[in-house]
Amino acid sequence: MDFTFNEEQTLIQDQVDQFIQKEYDWETRQSLSNSDLGFGNDNWQKFAELGWLGISTSEESGGFGGSAIESMLIMEAFGKGLVVEPFLETIIMCGGLLDEHGTDQQKSSILESAIAGQMHLAMAYAEPQSRFNLSDVVTEAKADGDSSIINGYKSVVMNGPSANKFIV
């Protein structure tokens, strides 16, 4: 088996590594994590401009159609740099779910806005009583005309404070 990266993957890896080395030093990270937002919106916009926010989203949903390898390369560099921007929450978790299971309307409004760096997403899935059992769900959603009424509690919603939209 050949585990070498192709030319495009190597370019992505180099680009993200260079960004972290040049623009994400420890002092910058500390300043961002201590800000009201908890991360840098300017960085989020750079990530969008560089195409990183759409790299793993299918072309049909407005992304670049990359694979898990491209996402892994970005996540690895972000891990090394202790990046605080909500890439995992907005792009990998919520974006991946919308890409695979969202309606065309959700993809065109929510997912494309997230890829453009204009929206932050959060997934509200954990419940206080469930601990690590994701099938222990008490929260209920009931149809009410064209909308739904949700009753229940969610806990530890990563990126909740800065999210524009939630997936429950």
Name each region found by the language model.
Residues 117-125:
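A short, Trp-centered hydrophobic/proline-enriched beta-strand micro-motif
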Residues 27-49:
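Short secondary-structure junction/hinge motifs that connect adjacent elements
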Residues 139-142:
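A structural signal for short hydrophobic beta-strand segments in well-ordered beta-sheet cores
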Residues 49-108, 112-117, 159-163:
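Internal helix-loop-helix
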Residues 9, 20, 51, 58, ...:
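Buried hydrophobic positions in well-ordered alpha/beta secondary-structure cores of metabolic enzymes
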Residues 2, 13-17, 42, 69, ...:
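Glycine-rich phosphate/cofactor-binding loops in nucleotide/flavin-utilizing enzymes
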Residues 147, 151-168:
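A short core secondary-structure module
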Residues 1-8:
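Intrinsic disorder at enzyme termini
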